[in-house]
Curated annotation (Swiss-Prot):
This is Urocanate hydratase. Keywords: Cytoplasm, Histidine metabolism, Lyase, NAD. Binds 1 NAD(+) per subunit. NAD(+) binds at residues 52-53, 130, 176-178, 196, 201, 242-243, 263-267, 273-274, 322, 492. It comes from Brucella melitensis biotype 1 (strain ATCC 23456 / CCUG 17765 / NCTC 10094 / 16M).
């Protein structure tokens, strides 16, 4: 019996200004779905896996084909419903309604665990959508680069006087998310040693210039790091190995990095983390044949790695969980103080979230990099005083290789997102851009996620696990007229640990799009300010007042 999730075909998004669907509002999700499976974008495109363990774009290849066929014929008053990667219905709505509504991986809380999900997955009844895999707005490793860069820069401010020159970062994982780390470190002025067990992933990052060098030798990696830091150079190296082996070995040797973190796919103990002593081939085979054995061995190995991270933390080295739930896995394995070191959001990112600042992104449906160059220039023009953002855009232009359709990530917040969206739409309307632009974001944003071990860890009022907020975010984006809206469970940290929502909106140059863009790109980040104001953060309360938000139970207006 053939595997419905495996196909050797190569998928690439159409380019140019010729429509394959009835309008740009259906052409946009069509192209972005296909872009998610571009071999230059996805981790394992032949298996529909985009990133993050088993984060898929569609449930099966038949479902992919059905989604594509449906989008090509969808009318401007119809909405396609996608249930865990399967196109289950088309319904009459109206022209300002989303063209696609997506729900991925959602389970009733009592059953929201990997065992139950994997059982459903095996039967073909579910699909893990991660965050931007199943919501069709993954743009390659760039999608996390700026967030990682902002994190490292803030760590430098807090611990090293704002200067990471001559410093180095130890981390693990070079997958779809972790692959951003070495480049982000270098852009922040630091060196990076990234441990990766799968050499094909390291090679992918070398090819796309996200990492500078590769080695199989720990001694060589350390020698390179030592030489670079002494010379004040910012460079990165991938070490082929197992983080659960390398991290403790560095502790044993007394090696002291300047910052320690990890972005292995520890959120998925079957598909995301290589057990100690295993080969990658053995691991892949046993994922199918004996997943329970894999999970047990992986969890035990995670405990070993987290203990090493605790050893670094106890030695006074800034150490953070980068949102893969590895501390939780170690805690469940009996490591009682696994949460002694913080997650990256409460440590470095939350003040940005309080102002609705997060991973705003856009992609050029034309496929022409010049369209991104023009939008970069427009961002600088509209935000002339944000020198930090200008610096980011300059570095991104120089260092970031596009994967699939040209795209840009740019952290901006409430008050700026809608201005950029309207400006991009005007550029489409007057012909400055060769085709429409889509604007989206990661589900990791200020108002769109409940994740007590990551984005909502250690909330001021203790509301870490309250997931009303992402549900309200999805509902409001739907009511506001986003082109497609998604509601997922388990992204980033795994089953049972998160709920989150996404939106994408198309700038097709029309006046109708102006109205939708103004609503969506104001309301979406405003929910983040609202959520943090409700939790009692002064920055959010002040920003809500400044932006004129009407929050009756919070501001009394």
């Amino acid at each position: 019996m053939s595997n419905p999730r495996h196909n050797e075909r190569e998928v690439r998004s159409p380019r140019g200004d010729e429509l394959n669907a009835k309008s740009w509002l259906t052409e946009a999700p069509l192209r972005m779905l296909m872009n998610n499976l571009d071999p230059d974008v996805a981790e394992r495109p032949h298996e529909l896996v985009v990133y993050g363990g088993i984060g898929r774009a569609a449930r099966t290849w038949d479902d992919f084909d059905r989604i594509v066929a449906t989008l090509k014929t969808l009318n401007d008053d119809e909405t396609l419903l996608v249930q865990s990667g399967k196109p289950v219905g088309v319904f009459r709505t109206h022209k300002d309604a989303p063209r696609v509504l997506i729900a991925n991986s959602n389970l009733v809380p009592h059953w929201a665990n990997w065992d139950h999900f994997n059982e459903l997955d095996k039967k073909g009844l579910a699909m893990y959508g991660q965050m931007t895999a199943g919501s069709w707005i993954y743009i390659g490793a760039q999608g996390i680069v700026q967030g990682t860069y902002e994190t490292f820069v803030e760590a430098g401010r807090q611990h090293y006087g704002g200067n990471l020159k001559g410093r180095w970062i130890l981390t693990g994982g070079l997958g779809g998310m972790g692959g951003a780390q070495p480049l982000a470190a270098v852009m922040a002025g630091a060196c990076c040693l990234a441990v990766e067990c799968d050499e094909t992933r390291a090679d992918f990052r070398l090819r796309t210039r996200y990492v500078d060098e590769k080695t199989h030798s720990l001694d060589e990696a350390l020698a390179k790091i030592d030489a670079w830091t002494k010379a004040g150079e910012a460079k990165s190296i991938a070490l082929i190995g197992n983080a659960a082996e390398i991290f403790p070995e560095l502790v044993k040797r007394g090696v002291k990095p300047d910052i320690v973190t990890d972005q292995t796919s520890a959120h998925d103990p079957v598909h995301g983390y290589l057990p100690l002593g295993w080969t990658v081939a053995e691991w892949r085979a046993k994922q199918e044949n004996d997943p329970k054995v894999v999970e047990k061995a992986a969890r035990a190995s995670m405990k070993v790695q987290v203990q090493a991270m605790l050893d670094f933390w106890n030695a006074g080295i800034p150490t953070v969980d980068y949102g893969n739930n590895i501390r939780q896995m170690a805690l469940e394995e009996g490591l009682e103080n696994a949460f002694a070191f913080p997650g990256f959001v409460p440590a470095y990112i939350r003040p940005l979230f309080c102002r609705g600042i997060g991973p705003f992104r856009w992609a050029a449906l034309s496929g022409d990099p010049e369209d991104i160059a023009k939008t970069d220039a427009k961002v600088k023009e509209l935000l002339p005083d944000n020198k930090h953002l200008h610096n980011w855009l300059d570095m991104a232009k120089e260092r970031i290789a596009f994967q699939g359709l040209p795209a840009r990530i740019c952290w901006v917040g409430l008050g700026d997102r809608h201005r950029l969206g309207l400006a991009f739409n005007e550029m489409v309307r007057n012909g400055e851009l060769k085709a429409p632009i889509v604007i989206g974001r990661d589900h990791l944003d200020s108002g769109s996620v409940a994740s007590p071990n990551r984005e909502t860890e250690a909330m001021k009022d203790g509301s870490d696990a309250v997931s009303d907020w992402p549900l309200l975010n999805a509902l409001l984006n739907t009511a506001s007229g986003a082109t497609w809206v998604s509601l997922h469970h388990g992204g980033g940290v795994g089953m049972g640990f998160s709920q989150h929502a996404g939106m994408v909106i198309c700038c097709d140059g029309t006046e109708d799009a102006d109205r939708r863009l103004e609503r969506v790109l104001w309301n979406d980040p405003a929910t983040g300010v609202m959520r943090h104001a409700d939790a009692g953060y002064d920055i959010a309360l002040d920003w809500a007042r400044k932006q004129g938000l009407r929050l009756p139970a919070i501001l009394g207006n």
